[in-house]
């Protein structure tokens, strides 16, 4: 009778309801199973009015300019906005609606992600040497707003969810929340190749997140990768009819995670557990201790790989070994029970993983009309 079955769907209720019972009893009401009074009549759920709307806006705009040869300046702006609204009414003909004498609810949420990215990309070739350098800055803003209202004990089902004030509930439920977080990044990347044979890439990122306290907001994450396309060497030229591609790769990189929400160092809640006279009064309480030294979770990974292609790409083999360590794991930590507030978000430890992966792709049939690839 708590409303879960009304919201779970007709099929769930139909699977659990006694099929020997008629749809309606002798009084014209929906029949109920006396042995399972918590199960609603599945046909009665058709009387529920449930309307959900969703609006989503995905937009992106960019500007490019080439002030000199080889230099590209680009500004990119994007938005991802998702708005949802749910309106529901459980009439007195349903099990839960009858117990609540009609129950109405409205909820709406607005989730937005704004992005600005500015980059400068420079490419230069000097003989057999190719250089590409990129520097940039990005800024992201995440916002979320939610509102909900519920009421019950209506004199008639005719209002549906259009007049919550018509309900005679002793304590109508009203809720709202809002969150905002920001991410700023500065990054750079340098690519170098020599004769398309030796390859080197180095990157550096500095990411700042408002999810952490002011002294711990910035994390620095470097990476470097080197490659050798050995099939371009002259001493392997006689084998190119068989070994069409061969590349050895080695890389090391660091990435960061700040996904802890925006309340990791300041978290309060509102509860109605304060009794004054015959009334319960809302109050604010600390539900989670703040952590001013909380910092980025960092993943460090080594990777060694070998790519081989045979018979003009008809057979391709990739072998990789990786070793990954994730340190300063972000997680909720339970404190000793005698603390009045016994929860805190902390950097709790680290994990380690390693493994070997082997992938083989073969193109068994390839012509202008059809191709077949097996893996």
Predicted regions: what they are:
Residues 24-26, 30:
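Charged, amphipathic alpha-helical segments characteristic of ABC-type P-loop ATPases involved
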Residues 1-12, 31-90, 99-375:
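Extracellular/periplasmic, surface-exposed regions of secreted and cell-surface proteins
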Residues 16-24:
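Phosphate-binding loop that captures ATP/GTP phosphates
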Residues 95:
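Conserved catalytic cysteine-centered active-site region
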